[in-house]
A protein has these predicted regions:
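Activity-critical C-terminal alpha-helical subdomain
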Residues: 214-253
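FAD-binding core of FAD-dependent oxidoreductases
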Residues: 1-6, 207-213
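Short, local alpha-helical segments
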Residues: 175-182, 211-219
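Short glycine/serine/threonine-biased micro-segments
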Residues: 203, 210-212, 247
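C-terminal substrate-recognition/cap domain of FAD-linked oxidoreductases
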Residues: 2-5, 11, 15-195, 199, ...
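Compositionally biased, low-complexity linear motifs
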Residues: 1-11, 143, 222-234
């Protein structure tokens, strides 16, 4: 854990792209530019629509910089130059798309619980992949999950956003919303979860990016985890938590 001074300076913008491919290239260049934005989240057109941040025709890049030391105008200006080089536009909006998305994001757990009570099947899954493999991976995941949603629920909505971007690659985060059948929602969810997880591993992604490693992911986590790392984790668990208090039976037996 690292304690940092509270930011005194902030600079932010929302950039829209007519094409998701252009937005992805802009996010990649930003991640590899050395500018180190504090926030660089890409909302695909479906994610923008479902969150109310857009009308579903454009992708939106939520961009922000923070510092406790200096003004950030030059950093933001250079980031916007990069976005403009990939046909990104800062458009005049009645409301700030970033603020709209942030509000929906914070309400997400409450909305999810409400959706479930109304009979909706809701699922999210996050992964990570290198930039050079992203497009094949993304198209494969979309195809597999859409087919599973059609088979399990008759159809639904599927969206994607980049939760994080790194010089090596993005961390795509997918959301699924589909109609449930009373009494069969869990089976429908299982079918979608299985298809998504199998596709992620088959296409070279990681079963989870940095959180949500737990019982739901265990079959794929164990398949992906190197045996040596598993033994090292088991040994550390026995040494540091001999009573098995912390997450018993989750990452290790």
């Amino acid at each position: 854990m690292r304690v940092q001074p509270r930011p005194r300076y902030r600079a932010a913008a929302s950039v829209s792209f007519a094409g998701f491919a252009d937005a992805v290239q802009a996010a990649r260049e930003l991640a590899q530019s050395g500018l180190h934005p504090a926030n660089c989240r890409l909302l695909g057109p479906e994610e923008a629509l479902l969150s109310g941040s857009g009308d579903g025709s454009r992708s939106i890049l939520v961009l922000g910089f923070e510092s406790a030391d200096h003004e950030l105008g030059p950093w933001l200006a250079r980031a916007l130059e990069i976005c403009a080089g990939h046909r990104g536009e800062v458009r005049d909006e009645d409301s700030d798309p970033a603020a709209v998305w942030r509000a929906v994001f914070l309400r997400g757990p409450h909305l999810r619980d409400g959706f479930v009570r109304l009979g909706l099947v809701a699922e999210t899954f996050e992964t990570a992949i290198t930039w050079d493999r992203f497009w094949e991976f993304h198209q494969g995941v979309l195809a597999a999950v859409r087919q599973a949603v059609r088979q399990a629920c008759g159809g639904g909505a599927l969206s994607c956003r980049f939760a994080y971007v790194y010089p090596d690659g993005p961390a795509p985060y997918y959301s699924v919303y589909a109609p449930g059948r009373p009494g069969q929602e869990l089976e429908q969810w299982d079918q979608i979860k299985l298809a998504a997880s199998e596709a992620i591993l088959a296409l070279g992604g990681t079963i989870t990016h940095h959180h949500a490693v737990g019982r739901d992911h265990m079959p794929w986590y164990r398949a992906q985890r190197p045996a040596l790392f598993g033994r090292a984790l088991d040994a550390a668990k026995r040494a540091l938590d001999p009573a098995g208090i912390m997450n018993p039976g989750v990452l290790t037996p």
